[in-house]
């Protein structure tokens, strides 16, 4: 086997890539071995005897397959979850969703005339204080205290 270490190094410098990315035509190895100057190497590059191999990318095929499976609901069980409960949806976002739902419900009841302004305000403040986890609890509180006008 002919040693082409120097030629490979010079070609790598000229083609601005690593030595491992240099391709040398196996049928013209003698010509490459005879090339000892940079000009000789440049001529061989021009003739297509020495080429730069393309960069090997990172295949996304497995990642795409994984994403497709996740769309179908696979890999989403409790064993696949990493981090806290709040890592997926923050405490503030959960609170915002809850309070918006409660306030919307209170507005609706007030618009329908089932709550007067004073009671609406009292319930609004209780909701703000975190007394109701959800609409169900709000309605249960209103029923227990006979607030809801039918």
UniProtKB/Swiss-Prot annotation:
It holds the Pfam family Ribosomal_L19e. This is Large ribosomal subunit protein eL19. Belongs to the eukaryotic ribosomal protein eL19 family. GO terms for biological process: translation. Residues 71-89 have a biased composition (Basic residues). GO terms for cellular component: cytosolic large ribosomal subunit. Part of the 50S ribosomal subunit. It comes from Thermococcus kodakarensis (strain ATCC BAA-918 / JCM 12380 / KOD1) (Pyrococcus kodakaraensis (strain KOD1)). Gene3D superfamilies: 1.10.1200.240, 1.10.1650.10. HAMAP family: Ribosomal_eL19 (MF_01475). SUPFAM superfamilies: Ribosomal protein L19 (L19e). Keywords: Ribonucleoprotein, Ribosomal protein, RNA-binding, rRNA-binding. The keyword tRNA-binding does not apply. Binds to the 23S rRNA. Residues 56-89 are annotated as: Disordered. The keyword tRNA processing does not apply. GO terms for molecular function: large ribosomal subunit rRNA binding; RNA binding; structural constituent of ribosome.
């Amino acid at each position: 086997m002919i040693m082409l270490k120097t030629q490979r190094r010079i070609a790598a410098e000229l083609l601005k890539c690593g030595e491992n990315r240099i391709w040398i035509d196996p049928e013209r190895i003698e010509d490459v071995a005879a090339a000892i100057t940079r000009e000789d190497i440049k001529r061989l590059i021009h003739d297509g005897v020495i080429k730069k191999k393309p960069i090997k990318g990172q295949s996304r095929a497995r990642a795409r397959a994984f994403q497709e499976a996740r769309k179908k609901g696979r890999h989403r069980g409790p064993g696949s979850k990493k981090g806290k409960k709040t890592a997926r949806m923050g405490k503030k976002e959960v609170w915002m969703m809850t309070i918006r739902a409660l306030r919307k419900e209170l507005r609706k009841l007030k618009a329908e005339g089932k709550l007067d302004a004073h009671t609406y305000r009292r319930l609004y403040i209780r909701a703000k204080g975190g007394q109701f986890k959800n609409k169900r609890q709000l309605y249960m509180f209103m029923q227990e205290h006979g607030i809801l006008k039918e």
